């Protein structure tokens, strides 16, 4: 865990005790006097005293997770990722957690959460912990809450540890200024994908007086993690093999909290994976460059990271990555068109090199093999044929074709 010490500098930059502004309200971050956050144990301590957590000790049983964002309908690309994540966990005799990543209130809708649960069950995917059977208001399992919108107090505690260690600073840059930085030479950081544009640490270098000036001008700050200078992260990806990145390649100092008070994805997902005992994360390769950021957060919080597997993405016939705008390829649209769930999962399993079968039968077969065969998965993105929905209904859909490596994202 983080030691009980507070740095007075952020990599050589003067740091003052700040009056925090969050969602238009001032607050003081907890100090490290009482210790740090233990996301796996029962006691969580901070400068405000000791808090009791409902989080049980981390289990050694393998654990995978399904972590949809309820911002729209699930599509074939989501089904591909969730099927592989589910099978990878079941192949090791592991449990599966369903977590709704509804951290952004402006985009998330409860009706989409319910639709997602119905779509997952339609595919034959179940879970051991998560929202109740109807995806209503109750949570079922020892690691609740299973909705990020309800876990703010846990993110707050993790943030306090990072702040007490001198690794957090306020960022007053506006969206317009950030867009200008992204458009500047070397500002876009080619290949960052969804990890975001490179941030050169503009507000990290502000003096205390400059920070106070921005506060007086009414600027609300976001909060960024000050990445250690020259920091690198390495990991062995189950699909892509050994990976090595500098944090600068992944965008530099990244946001932990937005200026409107919404917690950022990077912090939320690390806290949730740690407290839920997630041991393996299967997700699209478009998230690859988020992994070094998350590994750094795991290390700073003293938590053990999961194993990662970044799988290739599905693309439409034109080569565009599947997204929620592909309404005809949503699971709801396929169901209404008369496509059977067994046809979808069997087709996806064959595309992954796993043979045919419904998820339950595939899980039994893989369990007998003793491990998930990552080596069978394709290494490049896959392009669907035209009219794949109708072909799935007929039962004669051709397998997706590999895309050239340069079109993989």
Where is each model-derived feature located?
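Non-catalytic terminal extensions that flank enzyme cores
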Residues: 20-21, 25-28, 35-73, 96, ...
């Amino acid at each position: 865990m983080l030691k009980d010490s507070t740095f007075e500098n952020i990599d050589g930059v003067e740091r003052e005790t700040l009056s925090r502004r969050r969602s238009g309200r001032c607050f003081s971050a907890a100090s490290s006097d009482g210790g740090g956050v233990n996301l796996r144990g029962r006691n969580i301590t901070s400068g405000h005293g000791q808090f009791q957590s409902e989080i049980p000790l981390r289990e050694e049983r393998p654990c995978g997770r399904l972590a949809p964002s309820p911002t729209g309908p699930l599509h074939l690309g989501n089904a591909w990722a969730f099927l592989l994540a589910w099978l990878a966990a079941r192949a090791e005799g592991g449990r599966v957690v369903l977590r709704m990543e509804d951290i952004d209130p402006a985009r998330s809708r409860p009706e989409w959460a319910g639709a997602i649960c119905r779509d997952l069950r339609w595919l034959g995917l179940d879970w051991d912990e998560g929202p109740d059977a109807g995806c209503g208001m109750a949570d079922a399992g020892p690691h609740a809450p299973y909705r990020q919108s309800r876990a703010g107090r846990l993110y707050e505690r993790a943030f306090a540890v990072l702040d007490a260690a001198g690794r957090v600073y306020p960022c007053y840059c506006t969206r317009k200024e950030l867009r200008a930085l992204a458009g500047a030479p070397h500002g876009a950081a080619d290949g960052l994908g969804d990890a975001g544009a490179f941030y050169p640490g503009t507000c990290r270098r502000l003096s205390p007086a400059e920070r106070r000036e921005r506060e007086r001008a009414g600027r609300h700050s976001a909060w960024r993690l000050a990445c250690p200078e020259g920091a690198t992260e390495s990991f062995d990806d189950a699909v892509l093999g050994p990976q090595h990145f500098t944090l600068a390649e992944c965008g530099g100092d990244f946001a932990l909290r937005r200026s409107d008070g919404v917690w950022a994805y990077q912090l939320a997902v690390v806290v949730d994976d740690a407290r839920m005992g997630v041991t393996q994360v299967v997700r699209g390769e478009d998230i690859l460059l988020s992994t070094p950021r998350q590994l750094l957060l795991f290390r700073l919080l003293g938590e053990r990271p999961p194993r990662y597997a970044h799988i290739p993405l599905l693309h439409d016939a034109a080569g565009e990555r599947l997204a929620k705008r592909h309404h005809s390829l949503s699971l709801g649209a396929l169901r209404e068109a008369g496509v059977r769930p067994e046809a979808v999962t069997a087709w996806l399993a064959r595309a992954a090199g796993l043979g045919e079968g419904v998820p339950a039968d595939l899980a039994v077969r893989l369990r007998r093999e003793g491990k998930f065969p990552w080596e069978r998965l394709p290494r490049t993105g896959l392009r669907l044929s035209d009219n794949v929905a109708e072909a799935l209904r007929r039962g004669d859909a051709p397998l997706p074709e590999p895309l050239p490596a340069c079109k993989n994202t």
